[in-house]
């Protein structure tokens, strides 16, 4: 626990000094990472802690964004709600919409609940372009950040610190909620809702309240998005954003409180970096999600906790061989997959096909700093050899990891039993 607090303090300190060492473009990316982290953490209150998988949570993110923009235009950053407090309007919008939608959606559970949330979000996505007063039609609405508290909020650094403050406060409140009796009931709701009903609790009302609280914090994230971009349109209600928060949360780990924060931050950074390098970055995100679900169902945070437990038990030196083999194998295998996907993407692109029609020979493609001929055996043998080598190294890492687990000390249960007075050891 002490080490966890130290790591969190170091992380917070790093976030505070981050704008001083990053260029302006990267500060904007950092703001997006913070907003995505809060959105994922809000979603995990419903999914990971409450056991209710929603496929339409972007609706409450979007409602919070539009509500904040309307407040920005109406209040002009003055009065009781200056610019730094405008995300409260987003929270209110998300909470009210969450109460209304949650009342209907939580009438059912399981896959039926998920389909109802998806239907409600798609209904809003279809209606939004036609509701010009609320959502500005297809063009959306826009506003401007007004000065407040001696700050003009004209540069990305001030917006970053405002976003950081709201994200830290919101995540702290979400964690505090897990420690309350209501938070404990939320975990019990995930484990066995029927038992809660037999104990006399109103399960439907409990689900509605958890749904509304999750939507409220999603609305705060949407409000921060509105303050950052100063505009919004109906695309915020698109299914892609709802799917994105699901992927981020599960990749990070739904059973660890800060797991969604880790997953959202990493995947947002990956999206910003990879989208400038390749057209296939969404495919890589999907592959990563599939691999995590197949081989790391507890997510990246669960993997970190597992390795941390082994390090505390055995020390760094015992873990290094298996960790190095796993990282090396994953890196080589990833290189093979990227090589194959990028080669196929270039070969089947319209520009390459048009070039192929003008020339009977296969033109060379540029990849990893050199030219590769699609008709050459080496071009296709390279990813196969790299993939095979990566799989062999991963298999070695698996054997090393299993050997570590086999060396676990066996605890004698009789030795742990309290000894009766006069009993021989």
Predicted regions and their residues:
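Transmembrane alpha-helices and adjacent helix-loop boundaries
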Residues: 1-425
């Amino acid at each position: 626990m002490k080490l966890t607090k130290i790591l969190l303090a170091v992380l917070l300190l790093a976030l505070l000094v981050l704008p001083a060492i990053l260029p302006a473009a990267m500060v904007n990316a950092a703001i997006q990472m913070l907003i995505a982290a809060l959105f994922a953490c809000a979603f995990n209150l419903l999914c990971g802690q409450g056991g209710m998988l929603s496929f339409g949570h972007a609706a409450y993110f979007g409602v919070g964004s539009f509500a904040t923009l309307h407040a920005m235009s109406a209040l002009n950053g003055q009065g009781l709600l200056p610019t730094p407090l405008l995300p409260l309007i987003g929270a209110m919008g998300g909470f009210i919409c969450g109460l209304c939608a949650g009342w209907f959606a939580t009438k059912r559970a399981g896959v039926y609940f998920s389909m109802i949330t998806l239907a409600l979000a798609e209904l809003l996505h279809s209606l939004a372009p036609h509701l010009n007063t609320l959502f500005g039609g297809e063009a959306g609405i826009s506003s401007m950040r007004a000065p407040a508290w001696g700050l003009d909020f004209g540069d990305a650094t001030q917006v970053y610190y405002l976003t950081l403050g709201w994200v830290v406060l919101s995540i702290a409140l979400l964690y505090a909620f897990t420690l309350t009796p209501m938070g404990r009931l939320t975990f019990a709701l995930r484990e066995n809702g029927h038992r809660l009903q037999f104990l006399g609790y109103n399960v439907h009302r409990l689900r509605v309240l958890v749904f509304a609280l999750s939507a409220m914090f999603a609305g705060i994230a949407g409000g921060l998005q509105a303050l950052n971009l100063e505009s919004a349109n109906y695309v915020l209600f698109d299914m892609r954003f709802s799917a994105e928060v699901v992927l981020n949360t599960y990749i990070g780990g739904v059973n660890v409180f800060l797991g969604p924060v880790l997953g959202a931050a990493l995947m947002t950074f990956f999206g910003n970096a990879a989208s400038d390098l390749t057209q296939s970055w969404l495919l890589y995100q999907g592959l990563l999600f599939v691999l995590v679900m197949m081989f790391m169902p507890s997510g990246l945070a669960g993997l970190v906790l597992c390795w941390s437990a082994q390090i505390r038990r055995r020390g760094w030196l015992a873990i290094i061989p298996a960790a190095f083999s796993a990282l090396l194998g994953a890196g080589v295998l990833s290189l093979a997959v990227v090589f194959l996907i990028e080669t196929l993407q270039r070969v089947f692109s319209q520009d390459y096909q048009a070039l192929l029609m003008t020339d009977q020979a296969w033109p060379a493609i540029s990849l990893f700093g050199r030219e590769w001929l699609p008709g050459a055996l080496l071009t296709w043998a390279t990813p196969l050899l790299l993939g095979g080598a990566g799989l062999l190294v991963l298999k070695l890492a698996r054997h090393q990891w299993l050997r570590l687990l086999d060396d676990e000390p066996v605890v004698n249960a009789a030795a742990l039993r309290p000894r009766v007075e006069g009993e021989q050891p």
